[in-house]
Regions:
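Hydrophobic beta-strand anchors of alpha/beta hydrolase catalytic cores
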Residues: 68-69, 100
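N-terminal "domain-start" segment that seeds a small globular fold
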Residues: 28-59
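Non-globular targeting/processing and membrane-anchoring segments
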Residues: 178-189
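Alpha/beta-hydrolase fold active-site loops
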Residues: 66-67, 142
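Thiol/disulfide oxidoreductase modules built on the thioredoxin-like
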Residues: 114-121, 127-174
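Conserved redox-active cysteine motifs that mediate thiol-disulfide chemistry
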Residues: 63, 71-88
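Bacterial N-terminal signal peptides
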Residues: 11-22
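Structural microenvironment flanking redox-active thiols in thiol-disulfide oxidoreductases
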Residues: 80-119, 130-135
Length: 189
């Protein structure tokens, strides 16, 4: 009887390890791909959403700049971690032709302000309370889009990214330095 209990306990531990390993693999499944290139001339749909103070913002306000739009939710812990790397990348890139916007899926009253303050997030965080931006093709959170100064979607990232990693900084700098589409899978050296 004791051996059956030990075998059952070992099976639970092995199952737990397998689930954890599988989860971690899914987070890093596309590390080799920094971003998915979009077909040319796919126009980003305009939106009008409020920030935490109630001020309204629309995508059109950022026309003329490259814009990273990051979709996230409070219930997504990896989303909150990604936001800090996005803030750091924004500071490292320090480019007047770059804007970052985060769009929270849901109500602003669920502790968002404290998370933003705690993590030093300075870029605009908007609220999609009615979840009206579903047409953006967001399979999971976080998902981000890189929009050109002309308003076309150039790239999409699905899942978490370490935006302040050397590879992502180089990738973004290449986008900022050129109006030509950049290869979405540069060879990491």
């Amino acid at each position: 009887m004791k051996s059956i209990i030990k075998i059952a306990a070992l099976a639970r531990v092995l199952l737990f390890v397998c689930v954890c390993f599988s989860f971690m693999q899914s987070l890093h499944a596309d590390d080799g791909q920094l971003a998915e290139a979009y077909p040319p001339n796919v126009v980003a749909e305009n939106f009008k959403l409020s920030d935490i103070t109630g001020e309204m913002h629309e995508l059109e306000d950022f026309r003329g700049k490259h814009v990273i739009i990051n979709f996230w939710a409070m219930s997504c812990n990896i989303c909150k971690s990604e936001m800090t790397t996005l803030q750091s990348a924004y500071e490292l890139l320090d480019n007047e032709n770059l804007a970052v916007i985060s769009i929270h899926a849901g109500d602003p009253s669920d502790g968002v302000k404290s998370v933003l303050e705690l993590n030093g997030i300075e870029y605009p965080v908007l609220f999609d309370v009615d979840l009206q931006l579903g047409e953006w093709g967001i399979p999971i959170l976080p998902t981000s889009f890189i929009v050109s100064p002309k308003g076309n979607i150039r790239y999409r990232t699905v899942g978490t990214r370490v935006w302040n990693s050397p590879f992502m900084i180089d990738f973004m700098q290449g986008i900022l330095d050129s109006d030509e589409p950049q290869a979405a899978n540069p060879d990491p050296i």
